[in-house]
């Protein structure tokens, strides 16, 4: 099939180069956005009388017909069309004849594809907002039933201090909230229309850029036609926000993987979210969180690919930009599937072993800070109290015992201000209960935050 630009050339394009150059294999994903973009453009050309009302209506009806055929499975874009834009234009011309050739008046594929991609990304961002909110709700429901469940808190993967399990789960909700906010900020910049910038310099054709922007739901237009077609920073921002989201999902996944090991035994996976081994019949594998953790790398890779793609590219549009779509499409699909999988996992796939969690905080030194705080409450300087407790920890380790195994006279050997009430302060439940600074793990604070999140998430 002859290219629309072929009259400039004496010889046909090499068949391999033709395939190498084509983007129809992946940019056909933009078909609905391209149709909407073209319909808005045709309406504008009719409004500005570049086209007669009859011509504009004929083009619009033709495009609507193509949309219906596509949605009903009667039209499938593909080769030999070079890209989705030519594919639709060729289909339109075959439907309505010569009038279809007037559709591209006053625009270029450069501003057209930029518009399509922004429309597509806007839809994906709106979908992510729903998916991330659903995941937050899943964590909140789990937190509500585990306010008084204790779990060891870690720093450097070493036991640090006991926590409310709900407090731990609420931390994920906070991270996901920042992810939502990042996507909203990306949407603000995505929601700017480049349509009408044409190839790079604008057009002498009488157009109304504000009309097409409004038709397509954009809040504003690009003020510089070169800038409108020259950058893919909005794509990079989307993948960057996605990479940060995946880092959080990967963090959550890693913890779940650890929790369900025999060594931790803090939780178990239900049959709905676990798989077995082809060789070892005893196995129950955490494939879902492992896959999410593994897929994080591909999103990171897409971010690096896009950053490299735009590095050193001069103004304005360059063919390099064709390489933006596959990373964008795969990133969007990856994060969507990972959020959905994590939501199912949290809703149906994990059961906490409350007894093991309770036993774990009863048999360690994670209450050491509270022992120091006890002395601080007796007017002992913190640094002195810290050193005293360090000596007590060493004493216990040498004898393979815990604080709770000491007698009061043993405590008093280290400092005279220890009294019988120290044993109450050392109970893990009381340790957690006492941490009532704002944002802390104390039960009052956790209940407060659960209630706050119920209001925010409309639960």
Swiss-Prot record:
Cited HAMAP family: Arg_succ_lyase
Q: Which reaction does it catalyse?
A: 2-(N(omega)-L-arginino)succinate = fumarate + L-arginine
Question: Which species expresses this protein natively?
Answer: Prochlorococcus marinus (strain AS9601)
Give the protein name, as stated in the record: Argininosuccinate lyase
Q: Which PANTHER family match?
A: ARGININOSUCCINATE LYASE (PTHR43814:SF1)
Which GO molecular function annotations are given, in alphabetical order?
A: argininosuccinate lyase activity
The record's comment on protein family reads: Belongs to the lyase 1 family. Argininosuccinate lyase subfamily.
Location of this chain's protein in the cell:
Cytoplasm
Q: Which UniProt keywords apply?
A: Amino-acid biosynthesis, Arginine biosynthesis, Cytoplasm, Lyase
């Amino acid at each position: 099939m002859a290219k629309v630009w072929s009259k400039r050339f004496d010889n046909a394009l090499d068949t391999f180069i033709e395939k190498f150059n084509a983007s129809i294999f992946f940019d056909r994903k933009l078909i609905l956005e391209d149709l909407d973009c073209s319909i808005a453009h045709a309406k504008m050309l009719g409004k500005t009388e570049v086209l007669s009302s009859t011509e504009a209506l004929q083009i619009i009806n033709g495009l609507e017909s193509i949309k219906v055929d596509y949605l009903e499975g009667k039209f499938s874009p593909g080769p030999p069309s070079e890209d989705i834009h030519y594919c639709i234009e060729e289909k339109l011309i075959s439907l309505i004849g010569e009038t279809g050739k007037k559709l591209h008046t006053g625009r270029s594929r450069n501003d057209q594809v930029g518009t399509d991609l922004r429309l597509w990304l806007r839809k994906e961002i709106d979908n992510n907002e729903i998916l991330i909110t659903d995941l937050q709700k899943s964590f909140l429901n789990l937190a509500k039933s585990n306010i008084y469940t204790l779990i060891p808190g870690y720093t450097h993967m070493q036991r640090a201090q006991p926590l409310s399990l709900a407090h731990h789960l609420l931390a994920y909700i906070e991270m996901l909230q920042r992810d939502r906010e990042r996507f909203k900020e990306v949407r603000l910049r995505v929601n700017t229309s480049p349509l009408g910038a044409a190839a790079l310099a604008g057009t002498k054709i009488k157009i109304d850029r504000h009309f097409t922007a409004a038709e397509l739901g954009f809040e504003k237009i690009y003020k510089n036609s070169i800038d409108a077609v020259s950058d893919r920073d909005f794509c990079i921002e989307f993948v960057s926000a996605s990479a940060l989201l995946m880092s959080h999902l990967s963090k959550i996944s890693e913890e779940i993987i650890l929790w369900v090991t025999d060594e931790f035994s803090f939780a178990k996976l239900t049959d709905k979210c676990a798989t077995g081994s082809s060789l070892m019949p005893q196995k129950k594998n955490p494939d879902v969180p492992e896959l999410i953790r593994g897929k994080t790398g591909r999103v990171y890779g897409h971010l690096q690919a896009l950053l490299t793609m735009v590095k050193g590219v001069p103004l304005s549009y360059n063919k390099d930009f064709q390489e933006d779509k596959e990373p964008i499409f795969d990133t969007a699909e990856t994060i969507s599937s990972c959020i959905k999988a994590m939501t199912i996992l949290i809703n149906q796939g994990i059961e906490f072993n409350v007894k093991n969690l309770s036993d774990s905080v009863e048999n360690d030194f994670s209450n050491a800070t509270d022992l120091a705080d006890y002395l601080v409450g007796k007017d002992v300087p913190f640094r002195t109290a810290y050193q005293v407790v360090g000596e007590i920890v060493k004493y216990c380790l040498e004898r393979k015992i815990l604080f709770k195994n000491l007698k009061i006279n043993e405590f008093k050997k280290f400092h005279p201000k220890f009294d019988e009430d120290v044993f109450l302060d050392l109970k893990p439940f009381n340790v957690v209960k006492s941490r009532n600074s704002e944002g802390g793990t104390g039960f009052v604070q956790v209940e407060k935050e659960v209630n706050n999140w119920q209001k925010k998430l409309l639960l």
